Amino acid sequence: MASLRGSETMCNITTSCNVDSNIDQFFQPTLYIIVIVLGFPTNCMALWAAYMQVKQKNELGIYLMNLSIADLLYITTLPLWIDYFVHHDNWIHGQVSCKLFGFIFYTNIYVSIAFLCCISVDRYLAVAHPLKFAKVRRVKTALLVSAIVWLTEIVANSAPLFHDELFQDRFNHTFCFEKYPMEPWVAGMNLYRTFLGFLAPWGIMLAAYRGILRAVRGNVSTERQEKAKIKRLALSLILIVLLCFAPYHVLLLWRSVLFLINPCDCGGEENLFGAYHVTLALTSLNCVADPILYCFVNEGARHDVGRALATLLGLFQRGKSPETLMGASITVETPLAVKKPDFYSEVKTNAYKNDIEVLKDECLQMTILSVKK
């Protein structure tokens, strides 16, 4: 431990890795602008669609709302990061703003992953165990789980708020939320982020969708076309999480391991700098993929959003009250907004028959947002 602290002091005093910040001037700003242009309006519409589901007492809407909120918070940080990269990785907005926007930026990566995991588990319970876990899949439970997710990720990622996050390099650039070589506490935090923030939720998602596919294959009442759609959607979710987040966490883990082996070695940092920044930028594509995957590929939700936009345009043209929007554009039986049946009231009359019918309804109507209206 003493030698590690000595290495940290030596690195702080004598070592500043010669990373090429010029490579960030075009790719990251361009990508972030695209994410803002596409991600902000689509997440706003996804947030509205999720709110409509919550009004229908659908617990899935809670997770989707939180996912959209996390994406929108992430997007609000991008303008300052665009400015940062345009100025060759030079933060000009002070220590407080660096801490705040860096904290929001990185925390919401893991909040998004966590809520994608919650959605996966919720869909697994809806498809594979619609009766057994009916009481668990409620709005109150979803609210409690959401609060736990936010609290856990905020606490787990709060360490940078208590450290200086502005660092000068040898070219007088002011780095924000990055130091080359990294600090020991950052390496430890990166290990937590990689294994518990990314790999653990992704493993749960893989297990959940494996269970979904197994349940779908064993359900004779689901049409062949619907089964294929469910499988495509499940695979799309896994691939999006893999493509958006896995490259970044591979390099994050690589950098951290290299540092722990040789704390003051700049060779690895300099070689990985460009690729690391590219993979970090690619995580932003999740903000575009989330609303597309969970809302706009779905016929019912897409129809709702189209009706809402048409109604909104009509209100502006005719000058009517905006309140008419709330009652004029809800497709109650979209795959996202189907109300769960009251299992226990109907079972009183004919338990066996109604259990079978409810099971069929759940499997047909609640299979990963993909049942046709």
From Swiss-Prot:
Superkingdom, natural source: Eukaryota
Topology term for the membrane: Multi-pass membrane protein
Cytoplasmic face of the membrane: 54-57, 130-137, 219-222, 298-373
Region span, Extracellular loop 2 (ECL2): 165-180
Swiss-Prot/TrEMBL site (Proton sensing) positions: H163, H173, H277
PROSITE patterns linked to this entry: G_PROTEIN_RECEP_F1_1, G_PROTEIN_RECEP_F1_2
Glycosylation sites: N12, N172
Effect annotated for changing D89 to N/A: Increased proton sensitivity
An annotated Gene Ontology molecular function: G protein-coupled receptor activity
Regulation affecting activity: Activated by a network of residues that connects an extracellular-facing cavity to Glu-153, a conserved charged residue buried in the transmembrane core of the receptor. Protonation likely drives conformational changes in extracellular loop 2 (ECL2), which stabilizes movement of transmembrane 3 (TM3) and a series of rearrangements that connect the extracellular-facing cavity to Glu-153, a residue only conserved in proton-sensing G-protein coupled receptors.
Residue ranges crossing the lipid bilayer per the database entry: 17-53, 58-88, 94-129, 138-164, 181-218, 223-258, 269-297
Phenotypic consequence of Y248F: Increased proton potency
Record-marked site positions (Required for activation): E153
Effect annotated for changing H87F: Decreased proton-induced G-protein coupled receptor activity
GO CC term (a single one): plasma membrane
Cystine bridges: C17-C266, C98-C176
Subcellular localization(s) per the UniProt record: Cell membrane
Keywords, in A-Z order: Cell membrane, Disulfide bond, G-protein coupled receptor, Glycoprotein, Membrane, Receptor, Transducer, Transmembrane, Transmembrane helix
Entry keyword annotation includes Cell wall biogenesis/degradation: no
Result of changing E59A: Induces a shift of the optimal pH for activation
Cross-referenced InterPro entries: GPCR_Rhodpsn (IPR000276), GPCR_Rhodpsn_7TM (IPR017452), GPR4_orph (IPR002276)
Effect of Y110F: Does not affect proton potency
UniProt domain comment: A multitude of proton-sensing residues, which include extracellular histidine residues or triad of buried acidic residues, contribute to activation of the G-protein coupled receptor activity and pH sensitivity.
Family: Belongs to the G-protein coupled receptor 1 family.
Stated name of the protein: G-protein coupled receptor 4
Native source species: Danio rerio
Gene: gpr4
